[in-house]
Design a protein with these regions (language model features):
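A generic "folded-domain core" signal
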Residues: 2-4, 22-187
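Sec-dependent N-terminal signal peptides
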Residues: 1-23
């Protein structure tokens, strides 16, 4: 993974940190995410270790550490469009009491009020969207999504761009369990 790719992921992750707790109650629909706030004096990311398709990273945000695992898709559809930088991240922010928060990040603005679907071995998870990112719609399903990632073989992410283009991404789940284990003790 290139330095530019990692730096882009960090910038997006840092900018979206204020959205981390913007989870939607299932019965009432998605809540409006809070205004994103960039952390003060965030240091660049440090790669802890690479585990096949997934890297484990950390950076300092204020007085606390943020740890995350990150992967890029193995395929992007449709192949004829510029997708920009695409990532799937699972972050852990102990200073904010956030543990294993999955997030899809894309290089384009997603269609407003659209849903992103994550499919792992035929099990679907729904994410709500805001600008160039998506989070699990029902926070209570985050542990199930992470557990499915640890034991699954294949993961795909389907989205709709602001222009109405249907996009999909395939990810390898090789190394995700080891990468998550590596950030387990993030403090």
């Amino acid at each position: 993974m290139s330095v530019r790719t990692i730096a882009t992921a960090l910038a997006i992750l840092a900018a979206s940190a204020g959205l981390a707790s913007a989870q939607a109650p299932k019965a009432t629909g998605p809540a409006k995410p809070q205004q994103a706030q960039a952390p003060a004096a965030a240091a660049g990311p440090t790669r802890i270790q690479q585990f096949k398709a997934w890297g484990a990273y950390s950076y300092k945000s204020g007085a606390s550490n943020v740890c995350y695992v990150l992967s890029v898709p193995t395929t992007k559809e449709p192949a004829s469009v510029d997708h920009g930088d695409i990532f799937f991240i699972v972050s852990q922010r102990p200073g904010q009491n956030i543990s294993y928060e999955p997030q899809a990040m894309v290089g384009y603005v997603l269609q407003p009020n659209s849903k992103v679907t994550v499919t792992i071995d035929k099990k679907n998870f729904t994410m709500f969207t805001k600008d160039k990112a998506a989070w699990v719609e029902n926070a209570a399903e985050e542990p199930a999504l992470v557990a499915a990632m640890k034991t699954g073989q294949n993961m795909s992410v389907s989205a709709v761009s602001g222009r109405g283009t249907k996009t999909s991404y395939a990810y390898s789940l090789q190394g995700i369990a080891a990468a998550l284990k590596q950030i387990e003790t993030c403090k």
